[in-house]
Each structure stands twice: as structure tokens, then as C-alpha cells.
Amino acid sequence: MKEFQFDTLWAVMQIMLGAFFWPALIVIILTIAAFCYLLIKEKGLVACRLKGSSLVGLLGGILALYLLFSISQASISDIGGPIDLILVVLAYFGGFLASTMLLYSIIGFVKPRSCACQKN
């Protein structure tokens, strides 16, 4: 395989995630929509909320890798080619970004414009 093809990446991702692929895709789309809505509503990012959410994002990336290997038939020893390694790295960063954006959005809807590090 000398060239990168998006179809291959898509097919391998569907095989690795199995039945969780489409529900995960729907949750990702809803999370992105909620995050963008908050950005427009608040006219920017709240730095304190983003900092706390990104710390949880580190755990979200690790959880994404755990879920990836627990729901698929693959294990860490099955990582052989470059496409497998690319998907593992993408899964970590996807879990990091998704959990960061999800927590940022949840906190933004529950406590709008409030942050512990802001002085009132």
C-alpha cells in the first residue's frame, strides 16, 4: 500500500468498532454541534472551563483506547502496519477531543459563564 486512502481508514474503523461505530458517530456529531452552539452563544471559549475539561480529556483518550481494544477482536499485539498505528493514535486523540468537548459543553449548559477561577 503506497498511498493513503480514506476508504481504507473508514473500513478499518468500522471493523474495529463494530456495532458501536454508528452510535459513536452520532454522539460525536451532537457533541460538536453543542460545542459550536456554546462558542457562538458565549462569543468565545471560557479558558478556565477549557482547562478543566482538557484534564478530563487525558482520561478520555485512555478510555477510548480501552474501549477500542475491548470491543474489537484486536489486541495491542495485533498492531502491525502503519494504518493500525494511525488508527490507534486517532482513537486516542478522538477520545481526548470528544471527552474535552463533551465535558466543556455539559458544564457550559449547566453553569453558563461561571468558572471557579474567575473573580466576580
UniProtKB/Swiss-Prot annotation:
Keyword annotations of the record: Cell membrane, Membrane, Transmembrane, Transmembrane helix
Sequence intervals crossing the membrane: 20-39, 52-71, 86-108
Membrane topology: Multi-pass membrane protein
InterPro entries, sorted: DUF5368 (IPR035308)
Localization of this protein: Cell membrane
Species for this entry: Pasteurella multocida (strain Pm70)
Main location: membrane
The keyword Transmembrane is annotated on this UniProt entry: yes
Gene Ontology terms: cellular component: plasma membrane
The protein's name: Uncharacterized protein PM1478
Record lineage: Bacteria, Pseudomonadati, Pseudomonadota, Gammaproteobacteria, Pasteurellales
